[in-house]
Amino acid sequence: SEMCIRDSYTGYISLTNMNLFHWSNYEFIGLSNYSRALLKADSGFLGALFTTLLWTTLNMVIQVVVAYFIALGFQREDLKGKRVYKTLLMFPWAMPAYVSILLWRVGIYNTEFGLLNKILVALGFGKVNFLSTNVPAFLSCMTLNLWMALPFMIMMIDGALSSIDRSYYESAELDGAGFWSKNIHITVPAMKGIIAPAVIMTTFTTFKQFDIVYLLTMQKGAYSGATLQTIITYAQQNAFVSNNYGLSSAVSIIIFFLIMVFSLFTNRGVKEENYD
């Protein structure tokens, strides 16, 4: 198939020194691109991999925890206007990613007229360039990613919570169970298998997130100053900025195998959960 041919060609290029200077006269160099990416600290790949793993872990932990407690709030019978809240909640998720990122870059994070800096100035503080250094840029990207991704996770958890039989909670209350006890022993075990596919899918999406990091910090002609790199932006930069196609292809193959390994482990985990 076309995909197999494309992947095979990428694998072949990863074993060559194809770049801007060796476009038509590239040579076979074996696993040199792989060793450069994985074994040489100055290649930048290991740093990008660490950033990607940190990015994925923090985003998913915060996303699931925050979504869980917001979804619990939606389960309150005395909460009025649930449909209105849920409808409003879908806007960040339904809005095109490019539009959301542009709005946040210009309307929220901009040094001169962004909302955050207007608030800081009003409070008597100086202006801050949120995208100029790596740590603030990382946190800014993560905040935007959470804003875009939380609605989906909230809706999935809300649906899972709605499917739990209320009689379990009534029995637990008769036994004197409190809020945390009910959540730990009833809610979480009951919804774990239901939301697992959504968590896995969102983890994949977060792991390979490109748009947010690129458009906030690295868009051509508008570099913010931060040198934040994930493995996806690292591969893109080597291919289309440095024109080092051999290394970029090797990184793409490494990413492919990382995703394959993660898929195998998550599928095994989901199967074991279903059998239990």
Which stretches of residues belong to each language-model region?
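A structural signal for multi-pass alpha-helical bundles of membrane permease subunits
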Residues: S1-D276
